[in-house]
From Swiss-Prot:
Keywords of the record: Ribonucleoprotein, Ribosomal protein, RNA-binding, rRNA-binding
Job of this protein: Binds as a heterodimer with protein bS6 to the central domain of the 16S rRNA, where it helps stabilize the platform of the 30S subunit.
Gene3D superfamilies xref list: Ribosomal protein S18 (4.10.640.10)
Pfam families: Ribosomal_S18
Family: Belongs to the bacterial ribosomal protein bS18 family.
Source species of the chain: Mycobacterium marinum (strain ATCC BAA-535 / M)
GO biological process: translation
Name of this protein: Small ribosomal subunit protein bS18A
Coiled coil location: none
InterPro entries: Ribosomal_bS18 (IPR001648), Ribosomal_bS18_CS (IPR018275), Ribosomal_bS18_sf (IPR036870)
GO molecular function per UniProt: small ribosomal subunit rRNA binding; structural constituent of ribosome
A GO CC term assigned to this protein in UniProt: cytosolic small ribosomal subunit
Subunit structure: Part of the 30S ribosomal subunit. Forms a tight heterodimer with protein bS6.
Signal sequence segment: none
Amino acid sequence: MAKSNKRRPAPEKPVKTRKCVFCAKKDQAIDYKDTALLRTYISERGKIRARRVTGNCVQHQRDIALAVKNAREVALLPFTSSAR
């Protein structure tokens, strides 16, 4: 016998769209040597923040991820957090 579904649907929250910072400012470039910029896209645990958290578009999120990985390879950024 099938269960009856008496749950109310959750009220829809308004979707807040963020504009990509790099699309808005065309002159701002993503470079692996700019660690101050890249640290804003890394969590305190050393993980790259998700696109839904940062609000970047697909292409710029890929560019940030690649720049963070390159900066880690040349020891400008840590692979993991230093605090335990």
